[in-house]
Amino acid sequence: MHEAFTIEQLPQSWQEQLKDEWSQPYWSQLLTFLKSEYANATVYPKKEHVFSALRSTPFDQVKVVILGQDPYHGEGQAHGLSFSVPKGQALPPSLRNIFQELQADLGIRNETGCLQTWADQGVLLLNTVLTVRAGEAFSHAGRGWEHFTDAIVTKLIQNRTHIIFVLWGSAARKKCDLLFQTKHQHAILACPHPSPLAAHRGFFGCCHFSKINYLLKKQGKPMINWKIA
């Protein structure tokens, strides 16, 4: 069980940034909790997918950060990337709204909800909490994952420059509070969450996808191809 959550599961660049987390008290408590949960309940995503966001987008390759909250809690949906579902899965409401905004913004129409190609291009699709019990949203909140993902965000803010932080909703903004408290060389795009409850309050019409590519082009970096084949 613990082998699934060792530092060796991460790319070298993330290992160097996060090595101190494995010796923190919260980490051993989190591992004990996860061992019990995976043994006695159905937990998403599968253990081998929990660190998919970090494996897909190494620290030194992060160009954009899109923060989610906790994984989808339906069967077969969560695979370690925020907002993403495996190919063949129906689009959850928030992702459907994300794709609706993408089409309105750039005319790109996506049919499949697997965002792996975005991650491969430098978009870190990170949830605040990395696991969840089946059918119980936020069931693994407050168990330690927040400390771990806080460390990820802090390392990116402090040890990288010119990252585009995409903050959809108040939880993502709060997670990146350090961006609003310190001087830095990052860009911030913020608007309401794409969930059906909030999307009409300013997510639709935010044009974040074209703005991301405008900023990347300005930085001399390759733009993101948002089209999913």
UniProtKB/Swiss-Prot annotation:
Entry keyword S-adenosyl-L-methionine: no
Transmembrane segments: none
Superkingdom of the source species: Bacteria
Entry keyword set: Cytoplasm, DNA damage, DNA repair, Hydrolase
Main enzyme class: hydrolase
One of the GO BP terms on file: base-excision repair, AP site formation via deaminated base removal
Documented EC number(s): 3.2.2.27
Cellular location(s): Cytoplasm
GO molecular function: uracil DNA N-glycosylase activity
Principal place of residence: cytoplasm
Any single Pfam family the record assigns to this protein: UDG
Active-site residue list: 70 (proton acceptor)
This protein's record includes keyword DNA damage: yes
Gene Ontology cellular-component terms listed: cytoplasm
CDD domains per the UniProt record, alphabetical: UDG-F1-like
Catalytic function, reaction form: Hydrolyzes single-stranded DNA or mismatched double-stranded DNA and polynucleotides, releasing free uracil
Protein family according to the UniProt entry: Belongs to the uracil-DNA glycosylase (UDG) superfamily. UNG family.
UniProt function note: Excises uracil residues from the DNA which can arise as a result of misincorporation of dUMP residues by DNA polymerase or due to deamination of cytosine.
Family matches, as HAMAP family: UDG
Full protein name: Uracil-DNA glycosylase
Organism: Chlamydia muridarum (strain MoPn / Nigg)
Gene it is expressed from: ung
